[in-house]
Amino acid sequence: MTSYSFTEKKRIRKDFGKQRSILEVPFLLAIQVDSYREFLQEDVEPNKRKDLGLHAALKSVFPISSYSGNAALEYVGYKLGQPVFDERECRQRGMSYGAPLRVTVRLVIYDRESSTKAIKYVKEQEVYLGEIPLMTGNGTFIVNGTERVIVSQLHRSPGVFFDHDRGKTHSSGKLLYSARIIPYRGSWLDFEFDPKDALFTRIDRRRKLPVSILLRALGYSNEEMLAEFFEINTFHINPDEGVQLELVPERLRGETLNFDLADGDKVIVEAGKRITARHVKQLEAAGVAALAVPDDYLVGRILSHDVVDGSTGELLANANDEINEDQLAAFRKAGVDAVGTLWVNDLDRGPYLSNTLRIDPTKTQLEALVEIYRMMRPGEPPTKEAAQNLFHNLFFTFERYDLSTVGRMKFNRRVGRKDVLGESVLYDKKYFAERNDEESKRLVAEHADTSDILEVIKVLTEIRNGRGVVDDIDHLGNRRVRSVGEMAENVFRVGLVRVERAVKERLSMAESEGLTPQELINAKPVAAAIKEFFGSSQLSQFMDQNNPLSEVTHKRRVSALGPGGLTRERAGFEVRDVHPTHYGRVCTIETPEGPNIGLINSLAVFARTNQYGFLETPYRKVLDGKVSDDVEYLSAIEENEYVIAQANALTDAKNMLTEQFVPCRFQGESLLKPPSEVHFMDVSPMQTVSVAAALVPFLEHDDANRALMGANMQRQAVPTLRSQKPLVGTGIERAVARDSGVTVNALRGGVIEQIDAARIVVKVNEAEIGGGTDAGVDIYNLIKYTRSNQNTCINQRPLVNVGDVIARGDVLADGPSTDIGELALGQNMLIAFMPWNGYNFEDSILLSERVVEEDRYTTIHIEELTCVARDTKLGPEEISADIPNVSEQALNRLDESGVVYIGAEVRAGDIMVGKVTPKGESQLTPEEKLLRAIFGEKASDVKDSSLRVPPGMDGTVIDVQVFTRDGIEKDKRARQIEESEIKRVKKDFDDQFRILEAAIYARLRSQIVGKVANGGANLKKGDTVTDAYLDGLKKSDWFQLRMKDEDAADAIERAQKQIQAHEKEFEARFADKRGKITQGDDLAPGVLKMVKVFLAVKRRIQPGDKMAGRHGNKGVVSNVVPVEDMPYMATGESVDIVLNPLGVPSRMNIGQILEVHLGWAAKGLGRKIQRMLEAQAAVSELRKFLNDIYNHDNAINAQRVDLSQFSDEELLNLGKNLIDGVPMATPVFDGASEAEIKRMLELADLPQSGQTQLYDGRTGEAFDRKTTVGYMHYLKLNHLVDDKMHARSTGPYSLVTQQPLGGKAQFGGQRFGEMEVWALEAYGAAYTLQEMLTVKSDDVQGRNQMYKNIVDGEHEMVAGMPESFNVLVKEIRSLAINMELEE
């Protein structure tokens, strides 16, 4: 049985799961956090760092040598500094959170004169290489003040892949096979067949060349190529007539001979008959070694070697020639004894390479190299050196080509080698044996006679011959995950390579001019590459911060898009489809609807990546039908060999599989196997789904399409004012809330010392206090009312009280959408399924007014508005309250600096920050001239450019931040903000110090009370120190005590030192903070001052808002009805929401109905507990009832709740927390059965049918039949009508067409499109149509005139020429057709 933590004891979920949990839900952000930790290797000592991340990138680029080789720059190590600003300061100031990277490099200069490369001198130095972004504890990055997430990428693994064109290339439908070697970086190498069965190669998808050119470039001759790919038949030529064949019987199979095949006198095969496997066996039994065949049997065969006249040295025939009768005669004449021919046939030994050699124009290695050079660099004149270098650099140098460990492992496995290790370049025995540099010699020594390129071609020809299969590129063994760390490393390497080029140039000057490493290295390219990646890469995304679940899901997302991946347009159906290998690795449900469907996936709950980046999923081992608790992670490649049972396979008490045949998966198929043949078993029923899908209760009763919508819409739920835990959950709510990082969890156990709304102070347990200056106090500052990326409100509320004893990991404070440490996305609403006057037609939702009154779905949104004062050509803009032509009333919310007060309630159009801009001299109107004459000059030289509240927004100002450029005097408001911030920090530090001091004195007291003193204030020698004496003593005088006991004396001295050390440390930290607060801000060029105003907007639920359950049952609120009109139950309780029952059957999401039944039972049980508490029943009675709920029929110990762990007080506290309903957990695919739901309804004294009689609120009459009623967890989604509703008055126009812009952001109009024009034409409403097409759109004069007419009170219009017609005329003129309009 589990023991419960302090938080969990407050409220326990009843679990309906039948399966024992073998594995806890892992840390959900591990894929991000671990990946980046390996990239930085920050806490690893420099000499122990693995070949990963920054270290690997630096090692691969250094050492850099000069062109002459007389100077080199070597890499020693690196270290990361401390970040200047912490996360909170970066968010506030709009900076990036990162740390400086300092790399130690060594400049070595060699002596030119010496022949042995003697070192002249060495200089070692630290070089700054830019800022490296740091990851926050929650797996995000702060870039320019906003939180971003780097999404992992699922890309095609490096290695070799075999495929065919599915018969699409050639009209005959013939399958053309191809192979492709994909490196991690470097050129792709393709091999492909053409319809005539010749074999070609392509480099980097360029034009194709016969494959023999590539082999010739490697150094192979025709004879060697043929010997590699074909077996050889040897024929002995008789001097006069006939030929003897050295017989290998197997090679005759399938042939038809035109002569009898006999063993001595016995004919085995008659002429004209096909030779079968039976004949072959007979031949083998007979032991026939040679076969006499006629000459015409040899004619037409292909020679495997050149044939030379032994006496004269004359070439009689070339390898790969077809033997003709003349040649045969020449062989006889020259006395050639034997010739070799290629063994080919049409069945399974195609003459592919032989065909290829016939179309190959080259004869020598040099010609082949030149041909490749021409293909890669068309138009450049080839030289021998250039051609050789180009070819070598393509596949054989570590700088340009890298298969990577993954690629090498996949390559070796695919071509059938046992060893998974090897070189990261392509190796070829022939090519490297001919080179004589050190690197080549090493390779030849290590790998002897293997050849990567030859083996790929061999496997390809085998597949073409019908032996072997092509690969499935959507198999997860062929796709790997690239996470943050790896992508950052690649980008960093790219930056370093750019630096390398510049350094090489300068190194030659280094020795003559005595340059230092710092002068050699320019860090800009590295910094720029990293900044570009984190700021604007396709995979660096603005974090979805709607609620905790959306954050977690965003970080666990796996995308097939992005650099080096697919594009939406090119991706076909196969890539997007669910593949059998997705099981337990990638969620089969959660993916976006729309163009990205299937390209963006989510990791399954238990999935993780292995060292190669392939996804693995855990399984329990099964031995001879016995299931163990040993867990093994398998990748898709390894899983192929095993038979795997489902998590719910039946087992007995001894963990033996009980069924005669167990449902299993094997190689992507589902089948039944006896227990003895099962190797593994799933760990958990929710293994296949992602976090979001695992939060949907009764998911197993929902159609997959609706489950997908349900999983996706949970991510859009807006955090409500008061979160409510779901009555029906799945049991992983706590894990999601914990790992999302929105709650505050205790880092160490202890006692709550002090608490207020904004922070919690914990005095740490003695046992957990570290040594040194650790004083054993943890201070947690809570986040109050800050804005998320999606403008929702992030706020944390304390859950503990002073004196509570907490353990490590306990939840101290709730964040948005969490309730006592559990994820709580919506509210539990009483729902009835019935039509109601057409107000819930087509998925509309009918709400009760009570929901609005109780603020159940009221959400707070925080809008950030920014006002920037710039330096303009005509002078600086100024932020002030002195604005021309504005009434006093409009300024009454501003202070003397022109900035709005905190707490002011503002509406659309109100001034928030007063700002004036100098304006140039312009033509004055007569009225302005008059004003000038009367009032003098001042009125006209500035214009009002204040920040106003945008249309459609109103709210309360909750925060103002003023940023001032360095060297510009701060205004009064900025100084006030600064002072209050300094005060806050000072109070924080003072409190910390006070608590630390108290803790130190308390420890000291325990060490000296009762000990004998030698002297001190008012103490004689030999007196004993007492508590009362210490209480009367000033704290600072404690250190005057002289103790007899040495330990006590030491304790006093130690305490004094500790306090002094802390005092110093706090002073230094406070000075640092103060400096940061008072320093000027780093603003964009030309900006003098920036003011940010934060508005809190309260949004109540209203018609037009989108809501949804967790089963894809979404709808729009159609009406809010008074409570008294809503249907009500016999108890008088009216329902909150009425949904249409027709939304259920066709969509097949029955999970919502089961949720409603179980939710009703949960609420009913809560009501019973409430009645018990109100009647002040005995605790034993409550204990018995809770035991009935939690432990009635649970066979599995894991879910039994051991109520004996709870004291009476804790039990009453638990009871109080259950009044709102007893939360239930029905895990995915392992949930509550119908019988269990019925039992719960019975226990709650509710009808087992889950239906009850409702009465019409308006008439009081009973409805015709009973209605399904119950509680459902219902969400309000972030698609609010307030954000979408919009109306244009007068706004901006498009520059060219002069038509109004579109969209709310541009304050645009509504498009009157072609269909609407047709409608008016059909009605014959000519004048309305003219008005729409001219003055209401783009007739500039007409619309100005109309405006004037309306001002003058004349309501008439004159339509002129629309601007778009002028555009048309201009476009026609651009085609050189003149068009003029005549009156």
Swiss-Prot record:
Which reaction is this enzyme known to catalyze? RNA(n) + a ribonucleoside 5'-triphosphate = RNA(n+1) + diphosphate
GO cellular-component terms in the record?
DNA-directed RNA polymerase complex
Q: Does the keyword Nucleotidyltransferase apply?
A: yes
Entry keywords, A to Z:
DNA-directed RNA polymerase, Nucleotidyltransferase, Transcription, Transferase
Q: What is its EC number?
A: 2.7.7.6
Outline what the protein does. Answer: DNA-dependent RNA polymerase catalyzes the transcription of DNA into RNA using the four ribonucleoside triphosphates as substrates.
What is this protein identified as? DNA-directed RNA polymerase subunit beta
